[in-house]
Amino acid sequence: MLNNAMSVVILAAGKGTRMYSDLPKVLHTLAGKAMVQHVIDAANELGAAHVHLVYGHGGDLLKQALKDDNLNWVLQTEQLGTGHAMQQAAPFFADDEDILMLYGDVPLISVETLQRLRDAKPQGGIGLLTVKLDDPTGYGRITRENGKVTGIVEHKDATDEQRQIQEINTGILIANGADMKRWLAKLTNNNAQGEYYITDIIALAYQEGREIVAVHPQRLSEVEGVNNRLQLSRLERVYQSEQAEKLLLAGVMLRDPARFDLRGTLTHGRDVEIDTNVIIEGNVTLGHRVKIGTGCVIKNSVIGDDCEISPYTVVEDANLAAACTIGPFARLRPGAELLEGAHVGNFVEMKKARLGKGSKAGHLTYLGDAEIGDNVNIGAGTITCNYDGANKFKTIIGDDVFVGSDTQLVAPVTVGKGATIAAGTTVTRNVGENALAISRVPQTQKEGWRRPVKKK
């Protein structure tokens, strides 16, 4: 079916009182992303010509958080119902486009379901997303005659007979722009809440002899809204369970799917193994045969084939070539790069530093603003002193260098190829190739030394 051009309206003006937060409800995150951003992404993926965001509470915070240039910001100064919210956006509707109505606190709506709704919308009519619930208390009921949708009755306005209806309105619908504007202009607030309900346009359409087609989502979670943190946490687990299932079916071994969080996009090779309590954030790529230990956090990084990341390691904005080993308890900060076969051990931190092929930093080391060659050994307790209190400086270490334990390299400094730095040395000047650098206080020894004793 050929679809008309389409724009999307996202209602996001609610305060979210039950969240007990200074943050607008729709900015609370699910899978590391604001709820409303999930909805915006779905609208854009669906091909929306325009996305109209109706906002009210916390507008400044919303504008700081949402940088999408495709957004048209529509202010709703008073929250007088869903129909009133749509009336604020109506001046922006084109007559010949379809208008899809979504909600900023319904984050798991899928593009597939929305496309089915869009395809099902009859010419001149309304496409409506509905579900059947065992307990529909509190929801607007779908009324029908001879199987055809005739209207929606809000729970507070429903008769006892209507409250027995199990099919309920999700609030998501699509209609033609010209029709939508005409129906919105006819809305009244003659109801128990004193609000303008968008749902009243269903009865208006029926009275005009327009067809209303109901479509059901693939999963109930797609249309579940969030009003409190408990509901948000439940949807988080639903989402994470779905992502884990997809990864398992695609060949990723998750040791415990219930203890894995994906807060972004994961691209992976074959035979990847991920232990418990691992968090993946942003855009992460894992090569073939990558192993990730328990408690690791990987963010916006590329991990090459055959790498092994031991438990409780944090990797952010880093790039690892093949066969690298990291951790446990290592931290790779933005700009860290490991070439093939490099090793970073426990309690080692790297930032804006490159570790060459086969090079090793095994223990208790800080490497910042550094360029380290191939086959270099960095001894325990080594520190690149890259900051003088005002500016950062670089340390360069050539190939085949041996750096002894407890060494401080005061940048800017260069250590030539094949050099050796003796343990306990503070390097303040460049070291030549194949040279030995040593800066220790000469050792003295006092024979027969007696330790002090406590005075009584």
From Swiss-Prot:
Q: What class of enzyme is it?
A: transferase
Matches recorded under Pfam families = Hexapep (PF00132), NTP_transf_3 (PF12804)
Q: Which residues bind UDP-N-acetyl-alpha-D-glucosamine?
A: 11-14, 25, 76, 81-82, 103-105, 140, 154, 169, 227, 333, 351, 366, 377
EC number per UniProt: 2.7.7.23, 2.3.1.157
Record InterPro entries: Bifunctional_GlmU, GlmU-like, GlmU_C_LbH, Hexapep, Hexapep_transf_CS, MobA-like_NTP_Trfase, Nucleotide-diphossugar_trans, Trimer_LpxA-like_sf
Q: How is the cofactor bound?
A: Binds 1 Mg(2+) ion per subunit.
Q: Where in the cell is it found?
A: Cytoplasm
What PROSITE patterns does this protein map onto? HEXAPEP_TRANSFERASES
Which residues does the record give as acetyl-CoA binding sites? 380, 386-387, 405, 423, 440
- Active-site positions, per UniProt? 363 (proton acceptor)
Its recorded reaction(s) are: alpha-D-glucosamine 1-phosphate + acetyl-CoA = N-acetyl-alpha-D-glucosamine 1-phosphate + CoA + H(+); N-acetyl-alpha-D-glucosamine 1-phosphate + UTP + H(+) = UDP-N-acetyl-alpha-D-glucosamine + diphosphate
Query: What biological-process GO terms show up in the record?
Result: cell morphogenesis; cell wall organization; lipid A biosynthetic process; peptidoglycan biosynthetic process; regulation of cell shape; UDP-N-acetylglucosamine biosynthetic process
Q: Which function does this protein serve? A: Catalyzes the last two sequential reactions in the de novo biosynthetic pathway for UDP-N-acetylglucosamine (UDP-GlcNAc). The C-terminal domain catalyzes the transfer of acetyl group from acetyl coenzyme A to glucosamine-1-phosphate (GlcN-1-P) to produce N-acetylglucosamine-1-phosphate (GlcNAc-1-P), which is converted into UDP-GlcNAc by the transfer of uridine 5-monophosphate (from uridine 5-triphosphate), a reaction catalyzed by the N-terminal domain.
- Quaternary organization: Homotrimer.
Q: What is this protein called?
A: Bifunctional protein GlmU
Q: What is the originating organism of this protein?
A: Escherichia coli O1:K1 / APEC
